[in-house]
């Protein structure tokens, strides 16, 4: 969602606990300290990074939306039907599209990884993942592991080979990633 990345790609930790009040309280006691709960939590000596993340978050979300719109335009040019389309309202940073073949999905994800600032040398391969019935491929060369605001993509290896693309800390680098991914998926020869 557009309110998802309050850390702006800078905060080294974060997360959400949701549920019934008494269960959230139990989680807070378990994750922080008994008796302190959510009132006083661990900050890992990083409040500066968290505040800076809050400060940068609106701009980072704009970069991710620009990346999504750019990707949607480019995908339409190569005959794909992204959801949402570039001309539609955006209430999320995720773009999904049917890659068409397993090779195209793998190529797209490998292109995103190759253009990433971290672990660009790695070539993701489909593998079994807990909770999925099919193999899944994931690409994310992120500064913060598990970050959803940094450029990443993934998808299950089954027809119609739907790819989920999201994020982008800055448009310039993300545009290069999307270009390389499309080239790798559809213009490899």
Mark where each language-model region is.
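Active-site C-terminal subdomain of aminotransferase-like
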Residues: 3-104, 185-189
């Amino acid at each position: 969602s557009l309110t998802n990345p309050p850390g702006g790609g800078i905060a080294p930790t974060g997360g959400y606990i949701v549920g019934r009040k008494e269960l959230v309280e139990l989680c807070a006691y378990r994750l922080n300290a008994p008796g302190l709960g959510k009132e006083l939590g661990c900050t890992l000596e990083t409040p500066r990074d968290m505040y800076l993340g809050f400060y940068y978050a609106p701009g980072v979300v704009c970069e991710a939306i620009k990346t999504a719109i750019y990707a949607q335009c480019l995908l339409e040019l190569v005959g794909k039907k992204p959801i949402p389309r570039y001309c539609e309202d955006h209430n999320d940073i995720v773009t999904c599209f049917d890659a068409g073949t397993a090779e195209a999905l793998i190529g797209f994800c490998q292109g995103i990884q190759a253009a990433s600032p971290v672990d660009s040398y790695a070539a993701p391969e489909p593998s079994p993942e807990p909770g999925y019935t099919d193999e899944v491929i994931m690409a994310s060369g992120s500064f913060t592991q598990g970050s959803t605001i940094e450029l990443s993509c993934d998808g299950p290896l089954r027809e119609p080979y739907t790819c989920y693309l999201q994020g982008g800390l800055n448009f310039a680098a993300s545009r290069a990633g999307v270009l390389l991914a499309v080239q790798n998926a559809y213009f490899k020869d």
